[in-house]
Amino acid sequence: MMQNLFDLTGKVALITGGNGGIGLGMAEGLASQGCEVAIWGTNADKNDQALAVLRQYGPKVSAEVCDVSDPNAVADCFAASLKIHGRVDGCFANAGVGGRATAFDEMTQAEWDRIIGVNLNGVFYVFRCAAQHMKQRAQSGDAFGR
């Protein structure tokens, strides 16, 4: 991993699906540059494992168990992350699920709704919370973390 690419000390990033794969890789990259990181995932054990990895980089890290397809859960988890970190400067809506059916034409409506709930609606719910937070910060004179 590249070191000293740029300094993100004092910045906070929120990453959904941050407990594995691309999301954890993004979290590691940001933390390695001094960024505080809040990760969200649906599996508490995977969240704990990811936190153990992220803590080695030094900045404050946190995790929330969150189903991004639930707008109330997203709002609650965003508030919890803000309570821990005080702000969010960057938001990465990385959480995603695939279909469980072996073929598209065998997919049930419930399965389709689950996929759309996470992969589409979840992105909207997360970015809506982030945008509201960032807009509020900008209106109070803290535009773009400056």
Residue ranges and their predicted role:
Residues 94-100:
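Conserved NAD(P)H cofactor-binding loop of Rossmann-fold oxidoreductase domains
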Residues 11, 60, 87-88, 134-146:
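Active-site loop of short-chain dehydrogenase/reductase
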Residues 127-128:
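A short, exposed helix-loop element centered on a Lys and neighboring polar residues
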Residues 12, 19-21, 43:
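Conserved glycine-rich cofactor-binding loop
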Residues 44, 65-77, 109:
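The beta1-alpha1 cofactor-binding region of Rossmann-like NAD(H)/NADP(H)-dependent oxidoreductases
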Residues 33-49:
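Conserved glycine-rich Rossmann-like NAD(P)H-binding loop of the short-chain dehydrogenase/reductase
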Residues 102-104, 111-116:
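Substrate-binding pocket helix/loop in short-chain dehydrogenase/reductase
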